[in-house]
Design a protein with these regions (language model features):
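Residues that form generic nucleotide/phosphate-binding pockets
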Residues: 22-25, 68, 260
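Conserved C-terminal "switch" segment of AAA+ ATPases
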Residues: 1-40, 45-58, 141-148, 186-189
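Broad structural signal for hydrophobic residues in well-ordered alpha-helices, predominantly aliphatic
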Residues: 1, 22, 65, 179-180
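Peripheral, non-AAA+ core regions of ATP-driven protein-machinery
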Residues: 57, 74-80, 84-89, 97-273
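Glycine/threonine-rich ATP-lid/beta-loop region of ATP-binding domains
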Residues: 28-91, 123
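Non-catalytic, well-ordered alpha-helical scaffold segments
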Residues: 20, 33, 37-40, 63, ...
Length: 273
């Protein structure tokens, strides 16, 4: 990049903090093409300053990147500790790497309708249907009130950031945990996320993109990850330095997930369902 703009290492330097800010705020990709484009913009700005003998944008200025690259396009994933029922953190894999996502469920008086929003694909919607049917068949083992008449309630499942398309089976256990939390009004444990496919029998199946999901969890300061026991081999293949500070809980069934993910504490002002 420097040679292409007629410059050398003495003309332009970039410190590690700025580089991290570029990666985190302006690029989110599996490669480095967009990173190179952003750095090229900084180099061109520096070249212009040299020619005009001015220093309009000082790299020590906190607005340095904003002045040249514009406002941030991406923001650091952050785990949210919710005190309401039905909100669970999941891990997803996209074309640009791992992401965390929040599954939100709510219930209201109605006629038994299930609404699913958040720009979700067919597979993810099917996971929501499977989760609800599993709950109806296993309410007793999940600690859910057997007297609930589902035909008298509407259930709404939402995944925020609706502008971003989402699909795949890996949110299955997150959706089911969200619904169980909603029906029992129990809190989800702090700093925990999960990923895994579910079946109508309540089995937890393995999913892909594990390394990318681990990196997303670390960015969000998540401490524990629930995943299928079949994914254990994928964890063993990941460089140990990426696993530091993380605890993995391997499960075979959804009952294992609920047992570990939910606390016995009710949320504040629980709903009577």
């Amino acid at each position: 990049q420097l040679s292409e703009h007629g410059m050398n290492g003495n003309d332009f330097k970039i410190n590690s903090k700025i580089l991290k800010d570029i990666i985190g705020g302006y690029t989110r990709e599996s490669g480095v093409r967009n990173l190179e484009k952003q750095i090229a913009k900084l180099i061109r700005n520096r070249a212009k300053n040299i020619v005009s003998k001015t220093e309009v944008n000082d790299s020590k200025d906190e607005n340095y990147l904003k002045n040249i690259l514009g406002p941030k396009k991406f923001f650091k994933d952050k785990y949210e500790n919710n005190l309401v029922a039905g909100v669970v953190t999941g891990l997803a894999w996209t074309s640009v790497g791992g992401e965390i996502l929040f599954i939100e469920s709510s219930i209201s008086d109605g006629k038994g309708n299930l609404t699913i929003t958040g720009n979700l694909g067919k597979i993810m919607k099917e996971s929501a249907i499977i989760a609800l049917e599993f709950i109806k068949s296993n309410f007793n083992e999940l600690g859910i009130n057997k007297a609930i008449d589902y035909s008298k309630y509407n259930i709404h499942i939402h995944v925020p950031e609706g502008a971003t398309p989402k699909d795949g089976p890996s949110a299955g256990i997150t959706i089911l945990t969200s619904l169980v939390s909603l029906f029992t009004q129990k809190r989800v444990k702090k700093n925990i996320a999960m990923t895994g496919e579910i079946t109508l029998r309540g089995k937890v199946l393995p999913v892909g993109g594990i390394k990318e999901k681990i990196l997303a969890a670390k960015r969000a300061n998540i401490k524990e990850i629930i995943l299928s026991s079949y994914n254990r081999k994928d964890i063993e293949e990941v460089n140990q330095k990426y696993l530091k500070g993380l605890k993995f809980i391997y499960v075979d069934t959804m009952k294992d997930v609920i047992f570990y993910a939910l606390t016995n504490r009710k949320v504040q002002n629980p709903k009577l369902i």
